[in-house]
Amino acid sequence: GAAFAMATVTDGQETSDGATLTYPVVKADAPEAQQRINTVIEDDVKAFMQEIDAARVAGKPPAAKMSYEITKSSDELLSLKTEQFISEESAAHPMSYAHGYIFRLSDGKALTLADVQQLPDRKEHASRYTLESLNKRLAEPKDGAAKDFKKLETAPKDIYMDANGHIHVLIQRYEAASYAA
């Protein structure tokens, strides 16, 4: 395939009363890929802003912030991790979410664990990236499984790749344990 240049990432920012959201804006060689990538990120930003607005409407103005880091960038893939934090005025616990993305720069697709299995350098280890293998590893106490750990029903969509090419799976607290408010 044609070689693509690495994507460039700049800060996008939304600020409003008590909230500062900094998110990645991606510029890629292929315009359709660029649009696809930015739409995925914008949808997550919008969903978080709706949560912030809902708290305001409920009369609990929150402090909220969002940040991101680029975890891996090559001429084929761009991987990002975002952190979202919201603390409502009277809530016992602040909530935090981490989202991970691996985007393919040729078409902008956000890769899933199933897609990762198909990457040329992963095929021989494809079984590592299955839901079954993930649940097995999560259930091992050394991986910090909560006592009330419940198996994941579906493969987590929040994944990212680090600089060494390792795949990290982010599991939201509410996906793997019962959450007591």
Go through the PLM ranges and name each one:
Residues 1-181:
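Compositionally biased intrinsically disordered regions enriched in Thr/Gly
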